[in-house]
C-alpha cells in the first residue's frame, strides 16, 4: 500500500498512473483483468492493477505492481554500480560527465 499527501480516489490514481512514463495500467477487476508477473516477463514497462482505496491508513491506496526484475532491478543496479565506480575514479574514465548526472 501507499500513502499519498492528499486523499486520492482509485479513479484519480488510475488516471495519474496511466500518464506515468513506463507504466501500464491493467485494471478491470470485474473482468478479472489485473497484471501478473508473467505479463511483465521480458517487458520494460511496470504493470499496475487492482488499484483501490485503503482505509487502514490516511490517504491510502492499495495496488498490485509487477515488473520484470531483471530488466528493472538488475539492470538499474548494474548502471548504479558503474556510476559509482566512475564517481570514485576506479575505471580510468576521463570524461565522467557522460556517466554521472549533475
Can you name each region flagged by the protein language model?
Residues 1-62:
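C-terminal substrate-binding/catalytic lobe of Rossmann-fold NAD(P)-dependent oxidoreductases
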Amino acid at each position: 500500500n501507499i500513502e499519498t499527501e492528499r486523499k486520492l480516489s482509485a479513479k484519480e490514481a488510475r488516471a495519474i498512473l496511466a500518464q506515468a512514463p513506463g507504466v501500464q495500467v491493467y485494471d478491470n477487476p470485474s473482468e478479472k483483468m489485473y497484471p501478473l508477473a508473467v505479463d511483465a516477463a521480458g517487458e520494460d514497462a511496470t504493470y499496475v492493477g487492482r488499484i483501490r482505496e485503503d482505509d487502514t491508513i490516511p490517504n491510502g491506496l492499495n495496488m498490485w505492481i509487477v515488473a520484470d526484475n531483471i530488466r528493472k532491478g538488475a539492470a538499474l543496479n548494474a548502471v548504479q554500480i558503474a556510476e559509482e565506480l566512475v564517481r570514485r575514479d576506479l575505471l580510468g574514465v576521463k570524461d565522467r560527465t557522460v556517466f554521472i548526472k549533475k
